[in-house]
């Protein structure tokens, strides 16, 4: 559950991601939550969602995140149907910058899709939702991600590294320009 919150003194808006501990344990998502928190906490890049703080109480874990008021690219495409080549180039340029940064930290994002690219108040595209991200120094064999965006290496279980993010980038770029999946 993500809700809008406001800093008491500065009145600046933030997104508050609340995750119930019971559901985290039931879904065996402890590692995913810890990874997301750790990865976002170390990220300092203008094209990656900023984390402002984390906390927990007896029942829930909270991430205080940068508020991205522009929605996601999926919503933008629902409104506009397609993006022209200039818009697509701009958003994909932001995404490539984000991926290059994430990959420089030996992290594979592994869930690149329209819904995980959100727009800030200035119209820049940012990478969000690091729940499936993983530090990859060699190959990993976990089957994960959204099926429509999965690279063949993931689907076939041959092992993959951060290069799978570029397959998903190609699918995303195609969807921006043609409002449909290439497959």
Model-predicted regions and their roles:
Residues 13, 18-44:
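Conserved N-lobe beta3->alphaC-helix segment of eukaryotic protein kinase catalytic domains
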Residues 53-54:
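A short, aromatic-enriched beta-strand patch in the conserved N-lobe beta-sheet
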Residues 59-72:
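Conserved short submotifs of the Hanks-type protein kinase catalytic core
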Residues 74-83:
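AlphaC helix of the protein kinase catalytic domain
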Residues 91-92:
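Activation segment signature within eukaryotic-like protein kinase domains
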Residues 97-107:
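Protein kinase catalytic-loop region centered on the HRD/HxD motif
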């Amino acid at each position: 559950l993500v809700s809008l919150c406001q800093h008491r003194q500065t009145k600046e808006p933030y997104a508050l991601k609340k995750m119930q501990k019971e559901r985290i344990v039931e879904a065996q998502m402890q590692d995913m939550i810890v990874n997301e928190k750790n990865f976002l906490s170390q990220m300092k890049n203008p094209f990656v969602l900023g984390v402002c703080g984390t906390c927990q109480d007896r029942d829930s874990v909270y991430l205080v995140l940068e508020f991205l008021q522009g929605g996601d690219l999926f919503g933008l495409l629902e409104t506009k149907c397609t993006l022209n080549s200039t818009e697509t180039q701009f958003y994909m340029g932001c995404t490539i910058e984000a991926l290059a940064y994430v990959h420089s930290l030996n992290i594979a994002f592994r869930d690149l899709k329209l819904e995980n690219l959100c727009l800030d108040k200035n119209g820049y595209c940012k990478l969000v939702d690091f729940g499936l991200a993983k530090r990859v120094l060699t190959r990993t064999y976990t089957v994960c991600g959204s099926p429509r965006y999965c690279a063949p290496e993931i689907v076939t279980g041959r092992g993959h590294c951060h290069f799978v993010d570029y397959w998903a980038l190609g699918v995303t770029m195609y969807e921006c320009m043609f409002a449909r999946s290439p497959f």
